[in-house]
Amino acid sequence: MRAALFALITALTGVIAQIPNSPRFDLTKPSYDLWRNKKTAAITVQQSFTFDNVNRRLFIVNRRDGSALDSGDLTISQLDFSGKVLGSMDLLGCGHGVNIAAEPVGSDTYIWSETDAAASGYGTALWKFKFQNGKTLNSATDKRKRIVPLPEFDRGTATIDPVYKRLIVRYQTGSVQNIAAFDLAKASAGNFSNPLAKWEIPHLVKELGAKVNVFQGYAAYGRYVYFLTGESYDASGGKLNSEVMALDLDTGKLVQGPVITKAGSTLKFREPEGMAIYKTVSGEVRLFLGFASGVAGDRRSNLFYKNELI
């Protein structure tokens, strides 16, 4: 009887979702400050950020000071939650830094990032390494294992859902951007044979309705993946066009948005840069949005969060 019922449900629905339902963030609700105008270990625009939810650490990635735009050289800063720089390390020839992920392993934090940057400055694979203050990793000489989760994986980046323990990657095949999700424990062990989800990202403007086709970061919590889009005031002619949206991680369908976010609207320059999920000690789950501010030669980090779930 149970088998017959399963067969009937499968026939009616077509596909059984591998990612169960969960609460999601209401993107229309206000954003709150964690900080504004904080320095990192680099003076360039922050590209993204991530949290180690177990060891309570925060990391921000920038292009390395003095490196060319297409060099793939990055600086990862560790900051405390008041914005004080605690340490940093450099990555040479690795990528653009669109997204990084932090995986706690005991008392250590391992960073997932791009590596082996092409002439474009974007990475062609992923790798994972322990954050160590003061250390420099050079992709040209470092022999640690490269991670290529799927065929034709290019310009790939990663984010981790720290609550539901999943690794989500965004990557390019040809000219198409894609999302894939994996069980974190399996992915960390090198097993990418059974993606929980895998789909092409709809065109940000033509299909999802964003104001501009400028992708600035993503984060995942439960059944949903969140995108941040938009330009700096310098690029937009002073117009605020930053938006957030929620998509079903199982299907790729738009669930909410695009919603204009006015977080940090008075900041100078104000370029959207990065998203991440953090769960506080008290259990509150937060969707963080990052923005760069300041002037060339003195860029600053700004982090805001939404915390209302529906």
Where are these regions (language model features)?
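A short beta-strand motif characteristic of beta-propeller blades
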Residues: 29-41, 84-90, 142-149, 196-208, ...
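Beta-strand-rich domains and repeat architectures in extracellular enzymes and scaffolds
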Residues: 36-72, 226
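Short glycine/acidic-enriched loop and turn motifs that connect beta-strands
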Residues: 64-69, 116-121, 173-177, 232-236, ...
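Blade-loop segments of beta-propeller domains
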Residues: 74-115
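Beta-propeller blade signature
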Residues: 72-82, 122-134, 178-188, 239-253, ...
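Structural signature of eukaryotic scaffold interfaces centered on beta-propeller domains
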Residues: 41-54, 96-109, 151-168, 214-221, ...
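Conserved blade-ending motifs and adjacent loop-strand segments that build the rim/top face
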Residues: 253-280
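Loop/turn-rich, solvent-exposed surfaces of beta-rich toroidal or solenoidal domains
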Residues: 208-255
